[in-house]
UniProtKB/Swiss-Prot annotation:
This is Altered inheritance of mitochondria protein 4. The keyword Cytoplasm applies. It comes from Saccharomyces cerevisiae (strain ATCC 204508 / S288c). It is found in: Cytoplasm. It comes from the Eukaryota.
Length: 123
């Protein structure tokens, strides 16, 4: 038998025969894989849409560094809605984004007023 005519020896013929007569199991696995990828992509798009909505809702606050003064807005550890709404750091301090997991308060704050116990503490 001629070597060019024998599909077992000719790489091109083997590739063509695999495309013309695909293995059903491989095709099924590929279809399942593609459908899983499509579902993951849809979930990712949904999360991106939700995140974008949160960003738009917080658009009144700064979400990133501004100018050269290191303002972080609501994300700053120095942020306070009454005293420091821009989230600027005091002089000689570096501004750090607030991370709830890192800066979680481990103990409850107890007021020590000494002789000033008659002063009402806001809650």
């Amino acid at each position: 038998m001629d070597q060019k005519k024998d599909p077992s020896n000719n790489l091109t013929e083997r590739r063509v025969s695999k495309v013309q007569r695909p293995n059903k199991k491989k095709v099924r696995n590929q279809v399942e894989s593609l459908s899983r990828n499509l579902e993951r992509n849809k979930e990712g798009q949904l999360l991106q849409t939700v995140s974008k909505g949160h960003l738009e809702a917080d658009s009144g606050h700064s979400l990133g560094r501004e100018k050269e003064n290191g303002e972080l807005g609501i994300r700053s550890i120095f942020y306070d809605k009454d005293w420091n709404p821009r989230g600027t750091a005091p002089s000689h301090y570096r501004n750090i984004p607030y991370n709830p997991a890192t800066f979680k308060r481990r103990t409850e704050v107890q007021a020590r007023l000494g002789n000033l116990e008659n002063i009402k503490i806001p809650k």
